[in-house]
Amino acid sequence: MTPSEKFLQKIGLKDAISEPNAENNSIKENNRRSFLKKSALGGISLGGAFLFTPIEEIIAQSTQKVKRFSGPSDLQITDMRYCIIQNVGRTPIIRIDTNQGIYGLGEVRDGADERYALMLKSRILGQNPCNVEMLFKTIKQFGGPARQGGGVSGVEMALWDLCGKAYNVPCWQLLGGRYRDKVRMYADTPEAPTLDEFKLKIKHRLEVQGMTWLKMDISIGEVKDIPGALNNSKFWGKNLAQWNGGYMDYANTEHPFTGIQINDKGLDAMANIISEVRSVVGYEIPLSSDHYGHFDLNNAIRFGRKVEPYRLAWLEDMVPWQFPEQFKMISDAIETPVLTGEDIYLLSGFKPLIDIHAVDIIHPDLATAGGLLETKRIGDYAEEHGVAMAMHFAGTPVSFMASVHCAAATQNFLALEHHSLDSEWWDTLVKTTDGRKLFEKGFANVPLTAPGLGIELVDEECKKHLLPTDKSYFAPTPDWNDKRSHDRPWS
């Protein structure tokens, strides 16, 4: 055997010509132990023993401090389990387990059904979680807009968390590296019973919580009781609830089809609310707006023109995202930036808006859009077309941190929403693996070295906030193990 062959055999890249006997094995093992013992005491001198040390002992010494978190090539998905946190109604968290003891965390969109994720379990069992893109392409056909995208997106989050843990790198590193060490947040600020109370809440956001970007809700619901403010509003009932109701109720009737119009008196009243908030915020702090109510294109343009003196950072979801031509008409008619996107699934859903520059800013929610990589692709595509990206978020710290990693890795990013700043327990659901806070004074901390998403659940805290109708906590889900369909979407 040549010296080269002996070397390859010793490092395991060439099979031995003959089986070694037990005596030789014993001698080698004693030599190895003796070597490691000596190395631990004093190390190997390059000028001395190193030149005469067997190659296997050199390899053992040089690699004894290498971190082996798993064998990524041999990883297999063995289970998917869930719990449901009572946050913004209900927010399911999923856990994908493997044959090597490491697991990944993901989140099904706030307000969504855990079964959007569980139905995907049979399609990923036995697969290597590090093949993220292949698995994503396998399951993405089962997603859809809004909460329907939560299952695919939650699984994708968990796969990246697993992959980062397997290779001992943060998720942002797997996405191509980071542009920033801190991620700017914007504070969602819901309506208050009175304008004075709302102004106090805004002041608290700035002076106590240290936020540097705010968002306010301003809707026709705030002026509905002013005589002559609205036209045709009483047809829909007294409260104009935007989220709850039957299929034919106001909440589920798209903006162009309600027949509601805002009279000048109503526009004046809504503009006055924004003016009062600006008097507290000033003009240096970006102030965005949302949740105007369901009224048509023409009234959206009238409202947009009315509030232009207050230089809002954006007008959000003026009409449903499915109408890109209407968004284009609004953005062409006013100077304030126009934004949408929290309910759009996949890059293909954003392209009709981006391609015609119907909006100035896109606004994906990573838990709907398709997960980390797809959301980065959306941001990159928008950047190529001169469109910025903000990010919607209203879930638990799991999806929050997934969004932080994506935001860190996407250049045209502006700000990430935080929807639970007033919760006393939201950030107790997890602990960071690098020991830092999730966020401080308006900025989220990007995990610089922590593998995966950089968080672990705090079980005792999560159990305090489980959905009352489902107190299970990562219980087995064997009913979802078997695949029962032929999934190919083409013939």
Language-model-detected regions and their locations in the chain:
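Extended hydrophobic packing segments that form well-structured cores
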Residues: 453-491
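Shared catalytic-loop signature of beta/alpha-barrel
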Residues: 122, 127-131, 305, 311-314, ...
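Metal- or metallocofactor-binding catalytic centers and their adjacent structured scaffolds
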Residues: 99-172, 486-490
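N-terminal twin-arginine translocation
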Residues: 28-37, 45-67
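Structured beta-strand/loop patches that form or line metal/cofactor-binding pockets in enzymes
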Residues: 63-105, 422-431, 491
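Ligand-binding pocket scaffold of soluble enzyme catalytic domains
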Residues: 105, 166, 184, 200, ...
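N-terminal secretory signal peptides
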Residues: 1-31
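Metal-dependent enolase-superfamily TIM-barrel catalytic cores that perform enediolate-based chemistry
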Residues: 182-328
